[in-house]
């Protein structure tokens, strides 16, 4: 997952 753009998932929040 590319959290630099799609930071709206549980993976990026953790």
Curated annotation (Swiss-Prot):
Single Gene Ontology MF annotation: toxin activity
More info: Negative results: has no toxicity on mice (ICV injection) and tumor cell lines.
Lineage of the species this protein comes from: Eukaryota, Metazoa, Ecdysozoa, Arthropoda, Chelicerata
Keywords for this protein: Cell adhesion impairing toxin, Disulfide bond, Secreted, Toxin
Listed name of the protein: RK1 peptide
Tissue spec. comment: Expressed by the venom gland.
Family (UniProt): Belongs to the disintegrin-like family.
Subcellular location: Secreted
Disulfide bond residue pairs: 3-12
Keyword check for Disulfide bond: yes
Reported function: Venom peptide that completely reduces melanoma (IGR39) cell proliferation at 2 uM dose and reduces more than 90% for glioma (U87) cells. Also reduces melanoma and glioma cell migration and strongly inhibits angiogenesis. May act by binding to integrins.
Cellular component aspect of the GO annotation: extracellular region
Keyword field contains Disulfide bond: yes
Signal peptide: none
Highest taxon of source: Eukaryota
